[in-house]
Amino acid sequence: MKIRLYASLLALLLVFPAACAFAQTAVTANPNHQQLLQGSDARTTANKRLVYDFWRIVFEAGHTEYAPMYMAEDYIQHNPTVANGRDAFLQFLTAFVKPQPIKPRVQLPLVAILAEGDYVTLVSVRTLPDPKDATKTYTTTWFDMFRIQNDKIQEHWDAATK
């Protein structure tokens, strides 16, 4: 009897961690954008604000007339679906974002805004369809990283694929 109990407990202990390995804690946004915009010094704070306002005004609201305030003309793009250069980015953007009122906050569900030196990374929630069940979704993270040079966005990376 004891052997069977120990065998059952051992089997449970072996199966339970494996099942937990496939469990996921949902990724959630941080609602406090003012906290996210705080930097360790004046430079990182300014760089965070530059990227945040670019995202809010140009990317989300589609106000491309403000792009020269935020983006270098020779902007470098590492997303494989968008060409280099500010003009190429704007051509890409205007194909799917039409100008709309500028909101006071970024609408992207931000998890974090990280800044180190000339680099700023937006970390956000990404909700995707569950490949095993089309009626469900799951959350994961997405990132957009920017390099700032001369107070403008000079370069961008993300996880996009072709």
Regions found by a protein language model. Give the residues of each.
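Bacterial N-terminal signal peptides that target proteins for export
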Residues: 1-9
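Bacterial N-terminal signal peptides
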Residues: 8-18
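Short, low-complexity N-terminal intrinsically disordered segments enriched in polar/charged residues
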Residues: 22-65, 69
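A short hydrophobic beta-strand element
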Residues: 51, 89, 115-126
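A solvent-exposed, acidic/Ser-Thr-rich amphipathic alpha-helical stretch
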Residues: 64-69, 73-116, 135
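Short, surface-exposed coil-to-beta transition loops
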Residues: 106-109, 123, 137-143
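A short, structured loop/turn motif at beta-sheet edges
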Residues: 113-120, 147-153
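Short beta-strand edge/turn micro-motifs at domain boundaries
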Residues: 139-162
